[in-house]
Amino acid sequence: MITIGIETSCDETSVSLLEDGNKILSNLVSSQVEIHKTFGGVVPEVASRIHVEVLNRLIELALEKAKKEFTDIDLIAVTQGPGLIGALWIGIMAAKTLSLALNKPLIGVNHLEGHIFANFLGEDPPTFPFIALIVSGGHTEYILVEDIGVYKILGQTLDDAAGEAFDKVARILGLNYPGGPEIDKISKMGKPIFNFPKIKCDRELDISFSGIKTAVLYLVRDLKKEGKEIPVADIAASFQERVVEELLERAFLALNKFNIKTLVVSGGVASNSYLQRRFKEESRKEGIKLYIPPPYLCTDNGAMIACAGYHLYQKGYKSDLYLSANPDLLLGER
């Protein structure tokens, strides 16, 4: 079965062809990072315009790379939300057009669902139930995944997502956008010598990054007032360590609470080298089976959408031509 996956929820246009739910035939990504870097963040209007410019050609190129024709497509999967409303509609209209023209089934996919299913793109997928941690530019959530399409949110960010916090702290430190890779890189040259405050929330699996972000801001401000040099690498390493340790602590709280031995981590921040090292260390120590996709599947991509769409369709889920973009789509909402 050939599934085409279309992802346009934010600033990446991506199209993928997948065979039988796990074999990637093509996975093309057109990134807008260099364009949005000028503005220090994603400009929704600009993102939508670029999706319009590149999507049709990207679909053709994905088919060429997979050595497939339009008539070979059996299922069309597309990101329905959450995301930027204009950007989402570009992908959905393309998917609807394909569905109508080819008379093939259509399935709307939650973007977060896609990140979870990025871990199913291989020969040894996770078995249910498992705990999923999604850490990206727009989301930080702990999820109990009981089955395909059956999710329970256990905890989430109360303010910034992890990736957003990385971007804001990078800006405070004078680093380039996007901040995650910049902090990851410069942290290797520093030491975590600053003790940023632990995160405290009323619910044990919720998380908040505003306190750490403010602590970084005040530290930099005070050092400047005193005329001291800003130890950017040390501050970055200290911030990164605190964020990762907080994410790790809550992940293992969730595993212990539900007596589960499988942990799935995905989203753009999951490609952070320190995060990967710490999660692997702790998982080995505690006997937890850990899944983290390769970096190219951590960031937004069409393959994860095709994979999620395939599994949802096999489970009996499907959409129709009334499918709409939903920028606030909840996980599990159909």
From Swiss-Prot:
Organism: Dictyoglomus turgidum (strain DSM 6724 / Z-1310)
Enzyme Commission (EC) number: 2.3.1.234
Pfam families: TsaD (PF00814)
PROSITE patterns membership: GLYCOPROTEASE
Function text: Required for the formation of a threonylcarbamoyl group on adenosine at position 37 (t(6)A37) in tRNAs that read codons beginning with adenine. Is involved in the transfer of the threonylcarbamoyl moiety of threonylcarbamoyl-AMP (TC-AMP) to the N6 group of A37, together with TsaE and TsaB. TsaD likely plays a direct catalytic role in this reaction.
GO-annotated molecular function: iron ion binding; N(6)-L-threonylcarbamoyladenine synthase activity
Family: Belongs to the KAE1 / TsaD family.
Bound cofactor: record note: Binds 1 Fe(2+) ion per subunit.
Keyword terms: Acyltransferase, Cytoplasm, Iron, Metal-binding, Transferase, tRNA processing
Binding residue positions for Fe cation: 111, 115, 300
Gene Ontology biological-process annotations: tRNA threonylcarbamoyladenosine modification
Positions with a binding annotation for substrate: 134-138, 167, 180, 184, 272
Gene3D superfamilies attached to this UniProt entry: 3.30.420.40
GO cellular component entries: cytoplasm
Name assigned to this protein: tRNA N6-adenosine threonylcarbamoyltransferase
Cofactor names: Fe(2+)
Catalyzed chemical reaction(s): L-threonylcarbamoyladenylate + adenosine(37) in tRNA = N(6)-L-threonylcarbamoyladenosine(37) in tRNA + AMP + H(+)
